[in-house]
Amino acid sequence: MKCLSYQKVRLLLRHCAHRSFLRPGKELHAVLTTSGLKKAPRSYLSNALFQFYASSGEMVTAQKLFDEIPLSEKDNVDWTTLLSSFSRYGLLVNSMKLFVEMRRKRVEIDDVSVVCLFGVCAKLEDLGFAQQGHGVAVKMGVLTSVKVCNALMDMYGKCGLVSEVKRIFEELEEKSVVSWTVVLDTVVKWEGLERGREVFHEMPERNAVAWTVMVAGYLGAGFTREVLELLAEMVFRCGHGLNFVTLCSMLSACAQSGNLVVGRWVHVYALKKEMMMGEEASYDDVMVGTALVDMYAKCGNIDSSMNVFRLMRKRNVVTWNALFSGLAMHGKGRMVIDMFPQMIREVKPDDLTFTAVLSACSHSGIVDEGWRCFHSLRFYGLEPKVDHYACMVDLLGRAGLIEEAEILMREMPVPPNEVVLGSLLGSCSVHGKVEIAERIKRELIQMSPGNTEYQILMSNMYVAEGRSDIADGLRGSLRKRGIRKIPGLSSIYVNDSVHRFSSGDRSHPRTKEIYLKLNEVIERIRSAGYVPDVSGLVSHSEGDLEEKEQALCCHSEKLAVCFGLLETKPSTPLLVFKNLRICRDCHSAMKIVSKVYDREIIIRDRNRFHQFKGGSCSCSDYW
């Protein structure tokens, strides 16, 4: 080490940061510390070490080293490096606090710092801080930079201020392709696909990001055929290759929309480009493979997700987290527990790992393993976070251990948030714990007075308890305040197109055929033992049992499945996506439909996947 100059050490650290060589960089740090070489000149090597750790995502160490550097020896690069690294690794609040500190200590704010600040505000969708940042940029005189203006437009676009985006765009003397793309993304998000298409055709030049925005827009609208045509034009006619950022963005859009057809197209493209499977898989390859694992799991094909995972030559903790989250959604908690030892031999688990494992235990009712996992957090150098407590409360609640769940919730180091309280309220509903539910409901109403879901859940509990008068009063109060429940919406992919249904929907072009099929389905499953579960429906003076049953029959997922039965060949699996939790009646009905029609029916609701096959569900009625 003595033969190494300071310049060479600095270059080595930069090389380790650039190539993500974390272990060699740490070893070099250790040698510097023990050899005494780190002591001088301080501003030369300390800054290099800090920048290495910040670039590598080791933010705790980076912050410590940054704090050790005297203020007089910190330059703009140090401040902006820490600022951008906080943003890159999701520590957005830290970024904001650091920017405030920079202003307080009169650190020179340049265009790089402002662009980073705007990016943080865009991610947080914090309009107040965004406008403050805009004011700072005006004072600093950096709005002459196209790059800064593009970041400013993107920030306002993420916050929904479309008119402000358009105003800034019109005032730009130089409109780059990035400027156009930011406007396109904003318009597609807030004004719709039709208006976005107009902007897309107006663009004098289109980059890969602009094409990806349009592809994601069509994916969200369910236009599979148009997506494939766009991809063909983008790749084969315009020559825009899909890099790992574009591929991951498209796979994320496929996962959110449930579009398996386009997801498979992207998978084939990645294979042809020899991504993911090479012996020397890069970080980019790992991210594409991880996005595929996530996409297949969220599109209901957990077997393909597992296959991609097994074929990856290199995996990181994000890959494992994606797989565990997917397995949790599919109710395969035991598999997650069995694979955990293999994971810790490959990578170090993080907070998200334990959230996924605890979620898997919750969806599978594995209480003892869940407790062991929760208590092992500190063994891996982690402190239990709110998300971990939320999973444990959910696990105990689902298992019927309501009192134990409430005790754990009250012992949390921070007050329970809406997720934790909402989870416990749901468990109270399932297990009929009205007294505890009433306490929880009062806390939830204080947090979110406009949320109808909790009050609807309470009214259902009162009905089940035979207290319909209280339920009627609760719902009547909501109606007087003009508060409506969130409507249930279901979508199904048939013949490369998405078809959406709401409860009692009659807007579909084939409504008459769908309702004829619905009548046939109800008649056949009644003969097979189906009895409508009306226990959660509030009685009204003008309603009777027949009307209640009719309302249940027209739930959105039943309409979607009936359309699927009409439009697909026998034995074709049906995949339905619902925005809310599937109700008890639809769950019971789908089990019988799967047996009577010999169909596999997969429904992804707000919480998890339900795979109905041969008269049973993959959740084992534990959901």
From Swiss-Prot:
Stretch list, region Type E(+) motif: 496-526
Keywords for the protein's UniProt record, in alphabetical order: Mitochondrion, Repeat, Transit peptide
- Where does the record place the region Type DYW motif? 527-623
Which InterPro entries does the entry link to? DYW_dom (IPR032867), E_motif (IPR046848), Eplus_motif (IPR046849), Pentatricopeptide_rpt (IPR002885), PPR_At4g14850-like_plant (IPR046960), TPR-like_helical_dom_sf (IPR011990)
Q: Does the keyword DNA-binding apply?
A: no
Q: Where is the transit peptide?
A: 1-16
Q: Name one GO molecular function term.
A: RNA binding
| PANTHER family attached to this UniProt entry | PENTATRICOPEPTIDE REPEAT-CONTAINING PROTEIN (PTHR47926:SF347)
> What's the protein name?
Pentatricopeptide repeat-containing protein At5g15340, mitochondrial
Q: What is the lineage of its organism?
A: Eukaryota, Viridiplantae, Streptophyta, Embryophyta, Tracheophyta
